[in-house]
């Protein structure tokens, strides 16, 4: 749950979490979205469950534990950017879920601290191994926060293992600066490509988006928007990316066959998802925007 303040005043509260935000956007687009997660058996957990159900997100692989659901407090500045403080109270035994039966044609998005948390690393790697071995297409969003920098030395092996499992990495310029301290996007791609990454997408706020694959770099203008809040923008970008890849029937087998012009179309759609989310306080694309996308695809 995200509790959002602006100018030191409470603005709103939103069911949140990076993968949850993406799943809600996909659910609003009538996509078969499943969330793998956990939350407490408290009132906030009940709100979360009901919200996901109402937004067509399948929670078969979510479990509630005895305790409090995690909270984040977001302070929004004058540019709509947020700084976060997290409040977590996990049980001793965590992430006791059933692993999905992945199959070719599935897309698996994972990331944030949840994907590198030492407390659930074994369960996470088991899921990633099964997904990769089953022919699913894996997308990794590091979503690495500044407050985890003190633990980077411990966490970097997990980040790089996640990169090895992934077909596509999508992250912000800020994420990669925190992780690798490199300013050259080309050098960054060389690094992650050496670990097995096939496609790297770097977003940088309102600046152009860069997409790297072997021997090719594609530049795409970011969709313009007057930001109310940037919370969930990257998550909605991921939703747009997954929506377009799913719609175009992209798989690990044909990922490298996508021409640069088609990648530009895919990234432009993803950027429009992010822009829509920046235009309001919800962490996901609006219901109206989702209907617009669905209507335009039906033509």
Spans of model-derived segments:
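Short, conserved phosphate/pyrophosphate- and ester-handling motifs at nucleotide-, phospho-/glycolipid
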Residues: 26, 172, 234
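Proline-centered loop/turn at the N-terminus of a beta-strand
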Residues: 32, 137, 168, 198-199
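Conserved N-terminal subdomain of the carbohydrate kinase-like
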Residues: 32-112, 293-299
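A short, aliphatic-rich alpha-helical micro-motif
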Residues: 101-103, 160-163, 194
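Short, well-ordered alpha-helix to beta-strand connector turns
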Residues: 104-105, 135, 166, 197
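Conserved beta-alpha-beta core of the PfkB/ribokinase-like small-molecule kinase fold
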Residues: 116-190, 208
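Conserved phosphate-binding/catalytic region of the ribokinase-like
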Residues: 129, 185-299
């Amino acid at each position: 749950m995200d509790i959002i303040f602006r100018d030191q005043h409470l603005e709103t509260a939103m069911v949140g979490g990076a993968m949850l935000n993406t799943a809600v956007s996909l659910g609003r687009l009538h996509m078969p979205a499943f969330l793998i997660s956990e939350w407490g058996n408290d009132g906030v957990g009940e709100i979360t469950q009901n919200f996901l159900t109402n937004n067509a997100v399948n929670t078969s692989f979510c479990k509630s534990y005895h305790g409090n659901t995690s909270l984040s407090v977001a302070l929004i500045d004058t540019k709509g950017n947020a700084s976060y403080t997290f409040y977590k109270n996990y049980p001793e035994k965590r992430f006791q879920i059933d692993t999905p039966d992945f199959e070719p044609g599935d897309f698996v998005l994972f990331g944030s601290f949840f994907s590198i948390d030492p407390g659930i690393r074994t369960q996470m790697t088991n899921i990633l191994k099964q997904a990769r071995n089953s022919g699913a297409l894996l997308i990794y969003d590091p979503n690495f926060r500044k407050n985890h920098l003190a633990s980077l030395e411990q966490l970097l092996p997990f980040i790089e293992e996640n990169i090895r499992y992934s077909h596509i990495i999508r992250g912000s310029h800020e994420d990669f600066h925190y992780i690798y301290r490199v300013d050259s996007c080309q050098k960054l791609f060389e690094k992650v490509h050496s670990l097995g990454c096939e496609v790297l997408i770097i977003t940088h706020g309102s600046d152009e988006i860069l997409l790297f694959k072997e021997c090719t770099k594609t530049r795409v203008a970011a969709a313009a928007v007057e930001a109310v809040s940037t919370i969930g923008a990257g998550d909605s970008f991921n939703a747009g990316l997954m929506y377009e890849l799913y719609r175009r029937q992209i798989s690990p087998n044909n990922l490298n066959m996508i021409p640069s012009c088609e990648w530009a179309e895919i990234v432009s759609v993803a950027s429009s998802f992010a822009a829509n989310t920046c235009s309001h306080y919800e962490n996901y694309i609006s219901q109206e925007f989702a209907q617009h996308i669905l209507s335009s695809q039906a033509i």
